[in-house]
């Protein structure tokens, strides 16, 4: 469904594309400037979790996961990081940020690519999204793109001294494909058998 061009860009529509993250210093500058926007910072940070901690985590996620920088009309407008939350089974957690330039249709185009990459390109079984600090906008974004509340871990986050839960939203491969779980398992078995035959 998605194919990168000779420059590694994955075009989402005529105005927007994703490129591998980190080839240019401006990619990192975009992330820092995005996070320092007061409206973003107020929804992101909490007790013991500041910009320095978050950037260190992003660096770790990129080392063992995947990352893209999003462009809209030749300007950086989003960043997307997939943390490998589990290697066996393969589960990814999505992180990132989307500027106002991509709100609406543009953000959904990015989400569709992320889901395709996780479930079809990498054959992952689950995509997760964490909500540490209460964030209705992020909840709405997850729901709009097919993710549902998976679980709630109480007593994990402190915001101005008030204790909140860590909430995890997720989408399974079955949800993504719109197929029963057993049918998806059977498809994976056939795929593995096909790979073994090619090797032999």
Task: Show which residues each predicted segment covers.
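Conserved GNAT-fold acetyl-CoA-binding loop/helix
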Residues: 36-57
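Generic hydrophobic alpha-helical segments
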Residues: 57-58, 114
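Acyl-donor (CoA/ACP) binding surface of acyl/acetyltransferases
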Residues: 1-30, 34-35, 65-200
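Short loop/turn motifs at secondary-structure junctions and domain boundaries
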Residues: 58-64
């Amino acid at each position: 469904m998605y194919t990168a061009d000779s420059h590694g860009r994955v075009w989402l529509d005529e105005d927007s594309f994703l490129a591998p993250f980190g080839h240019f210093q401006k990619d990192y500058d975009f992330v820092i400037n995005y996070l320092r926007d007061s409206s973003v910072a107020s929804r992101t940070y909490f007790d013991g979790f500041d910009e320095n901690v978050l950037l260190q985590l992003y660096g770790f996620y990129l080392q063992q996961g995947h990352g893209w920088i999003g462009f809209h009309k030749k300007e950086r407008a989003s960043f997307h990081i997939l943390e490998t939350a589990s290697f066996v089974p393969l589960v990814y957690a999505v992180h990132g940020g989307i500027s106002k330039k991509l709100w609406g249709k543009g953000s959904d185009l990015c989400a569709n690519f992320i889901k395709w990459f996780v479930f079809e390109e990498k054959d992952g079984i689950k995509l997760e999204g964490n909500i540490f600090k209460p964030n209705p906008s992020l909840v709405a974004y997850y729901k709009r793109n097919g993710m549902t509340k998976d679980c709630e871990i109480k007593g994990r986050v402190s915001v101005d001294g008030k204790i909140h839960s860590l909430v995890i939203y997720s989408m399974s491969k079955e949800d993504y494909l719109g197929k029963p779980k057993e049918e998806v398992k059977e498809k994976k078995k056939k795929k593995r058998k096909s790979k073994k035959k090619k090797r032999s």
